[in-house]
Amino acid sequence: MGDYLLSWSWILDAFETSDENLSQNKFEELLDARIAAFQQIESPVTGTLNSNKTTEGEEAKLSIYDSSHSISKSQLESVKKISDITGYNEAQVAYVLLVHQYELNTQYFSQLDNDSVLAQEFQRRYYAEIISCWKVLAFLLQACTDADSKWHKMATRLIVSIFQTAQRSGENAQSTTPSIFCVRIIDYLSKMTSQAAPASLTFNGEEAISQWYFFHFNLQLQLLRVIFLSTYSLVVCNSEMAISWFNCMKKTRYLHDQEFMHLDIDTGFSMCKEITNVAIIISINFISLEKQVLSFKDNPSFFMLSGNTIISLHDMITQLSNDSIGAAVSLTWGIALHLLSNSPDNIPLIQNSSVVSSKILQNPQNSFQALIIAALKYDPFTLIHRIISSLEDDPYIDGYSKIMATLFSSAVSYVKFSDSTMLCATTLFKTPQVYQLFENNDSVTRLLNFARARFPFEYSQFVLLLIPTFACLTSKQLVSSELLHMTTFTQSLPSGFKAYEIIPEPNVTGNALIELQESLHLDSYGFFFPNAERSLPKGTRGRIVSVDTYPPVVMWDLNYSLWEAVGISLNYIVRNGLINSHKSFVLTVLSSSVPLFQTDVSGACELVHLASEGLDGELDFINVICDLLDYFLSLSVIEDADYQICVSSLRLLREFTRFAATDVWAYVTRSLVCVGSEKGISLEDVIFDYESINGVYDFTLAFFDLYEILLDNCISTSVVPDDFSIRLKTDFVKRAMRFLCEVFANYLDWKYARIIQQYQIGHRFASLITKLLNVTFGIEYFNPKTTVNKKTLPLRELSHYIVQRFLVQQDSNRYLHPLLSVMDLINLLYTDIFSTISSPRAKAAKMWLISSFCAMKTLICLRGFLNLKPSELERELFSRSPDLFNCLPRLLCCIAPILQLLSALILAPWPSETPSLLAYMINSTDIVGRVCIQILTNPIQSTNIEGSVWKFLSSIMKGQQQGLAVLLFSGKKFPLDRMKSLNHNVDVQLTSKSLISLAEKRLDSFSINDILSQVPVFEFIFLSRNFWTASLGNLQQEANFWNRIVDAIKLPLTVKLDGLSSVAQADLYILAAHATRITAIQLHMSKLNKSNSSKKIIIDPLKDSMKDLVQHAFTITAYDSNIHNALTRAFKHENGDLHISDLRNTGLFPLRYGDNYFYNIKLAKNMLLNTEDTSFKISMMMSANENLSLLDAQAALLRSWSIFICAFVEFVKEDATLSILELKIMKWVLKSLAEDTIDVNVVQELSAERAALVFRISQQTLAIPISNEVKEHLQSILLLTWKAITTTKFSIYEDSNGEMAYYRPLLHVLYNTLNRLLSEEKENLSLSVGFVSGLLQLCHRKLSQLFEKAVINPTIEVYGDIVLLNSLHKCIVNSHLIRGLQSLYISYINDSFSVDNCLRLFSWSHSLLVDGQPYFADAALSFLLICSSSPAGAEQIVMNGFFYSIMESPLSTALSTGGLGLDGSSIQYKIWIRGILPLLFNIVKFLGNRIMNDMREFVLLAFPQIQYALLNWCQPPSSISLASIDESFMIVLLFDLLQQFNPALLQEIRLAELKIEMLEASTI
């Protein structure tokens, strides 16, 4: 494949994405190189294709945009083939193939059925590039005129450069002016009007030809937009431009006379109308009535300064004056000439002004009067209305409206006000921005006053009455009382009504003034009522404004509230069954009111109150709207007007829900059924019977909007419920969701008058279920795993319903299929996004794609979250993964959603092994790496997109996709066609830049101001190195790479953290953590490879700053308890059952550091709407989130350093010079534990991890040779460990939350260190009395506690803790450290009841088995043995019933029968030998005659075992074990001791004879 070439569609997509992270400098550099493209008007994507066979495998090079790109042999073959089929230039074809090289490859071409399909696929991409190029220019032109745009400065410079480099073609090619660029486009546009499809396309069928014309006319329209934007406020229309333009208009009747026959009727007519309408607007803009009223001196380039131009234009426009198409242009030109004739200052400035005056201005047959009169015959106001209405979806409609409004304000003075005038004004000024420009215009003010004066006699002007109010509400200005009230009420008098008197007025001949002599009731003949009485009071005066009609029309002087009158009138129509007879009025009021209620909530609420003033209830106007909708939904047949009223009613209900949700719930749960019923028509009937037949889905989309806001209401009332029934809400939302699911299951098969509505339905449904699932499973409050809460029932019911419909298996994918189908339509959507000129349609297509991918990702994450079986969705996505990768380079807006979807797919848990992505991409494995590299090397991609790529690549290594990872990092592919050969792997370099080297190169551009974008890069490097070294061996790096990594590790020290936000600090810590782990991997590898290179590249650079780094990493300072305490207090007195913990994110999705990290702020804002101090709570939650982000990042840094230190400790074994540093690290970590002041619940796990790390290091320090320096460090470690143990944040005597996980490793450290010092120092070790006594007290108190716990819960962990503390206890008691502490020692035994509890444990030990053995008996006797090493200890043991416990234990039975130890491995035998016998020896030694009675009883009991042990020597030597030797030895020693105190006992048991027998046996 050739080198990468950036497409215009990508550039356009980047502009339209509006990503704040996009680099303007990169854009500017890129477009600077492409300025020449805009001079190639006919084809800005045409370069030069040159043959070049010097490189192996390369056939040609494409030179374009100041760069050269290689064309491979296979590509060149494809170029020639497509060029022959389509008739396009080979250079144009080569460009398209290069920008789509991963998609349009040889394999793709081989799959196409025929040449016609190939031609269409090529044209789709070719015109996407052409049109995208001109859209980019249009974007720059628009940015030039918007001083607030971030692109303004860049766009201005580029546009100036484009205009300045524009040259004429032909004789004067070297001359340049800003207008030349426009002239060249106009000339090309004129040429396009006579172009036909390439001859070669005629052989490819009608579809290919039709497609060519479709793109051809789309390109025309885009060029028209470029002309409009260029001349709207940038380039003054000079003579050359005007002549070129109007020549083209005359030739084509404003571009109307072109061949649209190859398109279908609807498409052809629509495109023809749109092109002609824009051409008319541009023509009016060229004439520029705004400039006509100014002095021509201010515009020296203006074409009106040329008399010849004026005459030429006049002739051309006059020729079209009798054509309705050009009526608006003729009117504009006529007004311009009228203004000129009344401008004595401008006429002299015109060249050949005398000729202009004689031929035009003073010629009655050819004057402006004739033009204006001819134009007015065709009703240009209706034409203006149609033009603006047809262009409502155009991105530049505001500019068009302003131009037409200027014409309207000038032309309205030439005519009487009529219906067409009012309709035109309504269309133009309904946009607030346009109205505000002309609100002070005299003509517009007069027209609006006229409309108010004629109301309600002409109720169609109701929209005009609302325009000023709408403008105020949109700009959030206070609506004046004058706008909300009417001062006149115009109606025709009732037939035969005479109860009025004419008031004579001197000098007044018309519009007679009259006064009512009695009240005039309006019920009998009217339907619009100004007051609740529905009458005009007696004494009301008015003027008869129409004497030529009967009955006469009277304009009454009456002050009344407009909205109150609207409410009263609609209510009267509904209550009296007059809806059908006044359907037009109802439709006018409702459709006109929707935009007002869509503005500010407070303004909308105020309007509802005003409309309800004359009704029964405070918000009764809402009930009127509900009744209207109810009526039309109850009809057996629905007509077009009925349908429009239903749509407007639904839209109004949606807006009413914002401030009157209970009223709307009452209606929808009562009347808005979702399936057919006996009551009449239902939602199902409207959509499936009316909309699917007519292809218009306004009602469906309105219902989506209503349903979504009702769901929001369910969320906002989940904490503080409203007064409406939960059961009714649940019933409605379930039924509605079933209905919407049916809509979604069928919508792809429906007919569409506007395809954009298909995209909108797909987007709305996908967004709706994504939102619903995020709410229900996103925070703890709604989580179905938690205890059921009836307040959240509607949402829980819905979530389960969605899960059941979409997380399905293969045989039930009816609802899943439409969601997946969006991937089958990517080609179509690509055309709509880039090749068509409808911005709303392109935006809707993008949103549909993005929302569908997000919905799939949510479902996949949810499946793992709920531990469900893998669904058909995942299987389908795995099989479609090649298609997803292929579309990545085409759709910038979808890169992040698609990669996030693939990451979720890879990381989702499977019951067995995750499917291999490699297996599904067996024919295109190299595409993954190539596409990722293309995106990463794109000069204008954002940090968000780049981060998505790195995260996806990291997920490949995390998600058991080792096969694909190996190919990615090795630069190899695995083609299917080589499977049969022995050489399966074929080396094919991805590009000159591998993914790993590309990631490491990113480190060169590291900036402290852009930490967030670097975090995914460091994570990828860490994972890739970890994976690579595990799979393919060591990967060597250059020294500068390690310098950058070491610098990253030092960032917490080298960066001034106070100057960073909490989130930025958190990102910095995470980045440093990844860097630390990278070095840890290298240390491990160096140890395995027995290499010392890591010392030089890692340890030496870090050695000097190691202390600060370790202390910073292991000292947790981020947690701010004040924030969290204040947050807890804020929710403590919350009404309802909401706790702050309910707002925690559940972890359904990976969490990002920031103000939404731990607590879900987005949902909390909605849920806390009805609570007190909402803003304070949200602010505190955001602060807590940022604080917890920092805490989590510090924890990650701590754990990374733990990994590093473990690797470092192993490395110390190879380099003894680092041993002192190892000891210092122990001290630094212990100090952080000892001085930690953070809440125990927050740092308990981290404290345990730090303690475990210290223990691990201490295991390694045992081998360090003792020196004075080492001794000092070990003593410091001993004291710091004791300080960490005695910290007040934990208690070793409380183990309810697993505190021993913290203390256990520290006790090990104490033992290791103390034992090492005692083994070396012997009698010379000096420790404080407080330390030794405190340690003894701790041992006895904790052991006593453990003895008690073992009786209740005899686990292996308890046994291990007893053994550990016994060892520590023994270490002290058996050393010189116990000297002088005997009295304290005895007091600890007595105070803690340790001996008593130990004996109790021993008594129960026969039933407290671990792995079937009485290990606790052994542990208990070990403790007693240590205690018996002193006389006082031995006495305490005896006093607490030692002999009784021994003689009552199950062991006594074995002793009394003898034969214990026959198998040599019994734990009881070991207890006897190593526990009881030594303990008896100590007791006899210290207590002597005082225990002889107890001793005699025990000896007599155990005599069979004693006899067995001594006579065991008669057995063959092979039967005598070391244990039996120990046993005999201990018995002999014990009896020798007893000989001193009780010789009679020995005689009693005939011990002398036993000794003789034993000696005789031993000599045999």
Curated annotation (Swiss-Prot):
User: Which InterPro entries does the record associate with it?
Assistant: Nup188 (IPR044840), Nup188_C (IPR041634), Nup188_N-subdom_III (IPR048883)
GO MF assignments: structural constituent of nuclear pore
Q: Which Gene3D superfamilies match?
A: 1.25.10.70
Q: What GO terms fall under cellular component here? A: nuclear pore; nuclear pore inner ring
Cellular compartment(s): Nucleus, Nuclear pore complex
Enumerate the Pfam families for this protein: Nup188_C (PF18378), Nup188_N-subdom_III (PF21093)
Keywords of this protein's UniProt record, alphabetized?
mRNA transport, Nuclear pore complex, Nucleus, Protein transport, Translocation, Transport
GO terms under biological process? mRNA export from nucleus; NLS-bearing protein import into nucleus; protein export from nucleus; protein import into nucleus; RNA export from nucleus
Where does it primarily localize? nucleus
What the protein does? Interacts with pom152 in the core structure of the nuclear pore complex (NPC). Involved in the export of mRNA.
Q: PANTHER family recorded for this chain?
A: NUCLEOPORIN NUP188, NUCLEOPORIN NUP188 HOMOLOG
Name under which the protein is recorded? Nucleoporin nup184
